[in-house]
Amino acid sequence: METKPVITCLKTLLIIYSFVFWITGVILLAVGVWGKLTLGTYISLIAENSTNAPYVLIGTGTTIVVFGLFGCFATCRGSPWMLKLYAMFLSLVFLAELVAGISGFVFRHEIKDTFLRTYTDAMQTYDGKDDRSQAVDHVQRSLSCCGVQNYTNWSTSPYFLEHGIPPSCCMNETDCNPQDLHNLTVAATKVNQKGCYDLVTSFMETNMGIIAGVAFGIAFSQLIGMLLACCLSRFITANQYEMV
């Protein structure tokens, strides 16, 4: 059987695949960084033990960028052992992305179970200064919400007794003063009416779903690369025997 035309075809396909693979590495890296920067504040409030999915994606994406270039080099060199190493790496990437995808998908469904407790705890220990308190402020400002179900939840917090409702709840912070925020009746006209529970859980479920979907989609594409690399390695080895 003539193997050279098959080898040429497989090389072309694998080089194209390796380039696309490299692009997916850049995408994974970008999604991981985006997930950490965009969702980091929400994750710190939603879970007692935050998900590692963004970190897994960042690490995997960086590694893929490097090995995507290695895949192109191995294909051009036509080295069977390099191609086998490339296929082995693709299998490891497949497993890593599968773990990241499952982590994001499972965590997405745990959000509602943990948010009520952790966010309520954050409100009870709120002092307006520490990292967790600043995370609460960030959520309330960015989503224009207040409290868990609504602004009245703040009335049970120690902070309310001294300072009233936090200014981050205000629709317009320049129009809020401490006296208004101490009075729930007056505050009703000054602060956001929507609670953060529904808004945050919906936001997180949507965005963690994106992370999981990207990871799953790219993970299963590795199977194509593994097949191409193994086939090319086999045909190159067979061609070497034909030439002997």
Curated annotation (Swiss-Prot):
It holds the Pfam family Tetraspanin. Gene3D superfamilies: Tetraspanin (1.10.1450.10). Residues 36-51, 108-208 are extracellular. It is found in: Membrane. It is a multi-pass membrane protein. Residues 1-11, 71-81, 230-244 are cytoplasmic. GO terms for cellular component: plasma membrane. Its main location: membrane. The chain crosses the membrane at residues 12-35, 52-70, 82-107, 209-229. Keywords: Glycoprotein, Membrane, Transmembrane, Transmembrane helix. Glycans are attached at residues 49, 150, 153, 172, 183. The keyword Cell division does not apply. The keyword Glycoprotein applies. Belongs to the tetraspanin (TM4SF) family. May be involved in cell proliferation and cell motility. This is Tetraspanin-7.
